[in-house]
């Protein structure tokens, strides 16, 4: 999944 908080990244 990807997140923008606290930094943009995908796992």
Swiss-Prot record:
Keyword Signal: no
Main location: secreted
Keywords for the protein's UniProt record, in alphabetical order: Amidation, Amphibian defense peptide, Antibiotic, Antimicrobial, Disulfide bond, Fungicide, Secreted
GO annotation (BP), single: defense response to fungus
Residues where Tyrosine amide is found: 11
Tissue: Expressed by the skin glands.
Cysteine disulfide links: 2-10
Gene Ontology terms: cellular component: extracellular region
Cellular compartments annotated: Secreted
Reported function: Antibacterial activity against B.subtilis, E.coli, S.aureus, M.luteus, P.putida and S.cerevisiae.
Protein name from the UniProt record: Tigerinin-1
């Amino acid at each position: 999944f990807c997140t923008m908080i606290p930094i943009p990244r995908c796992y």
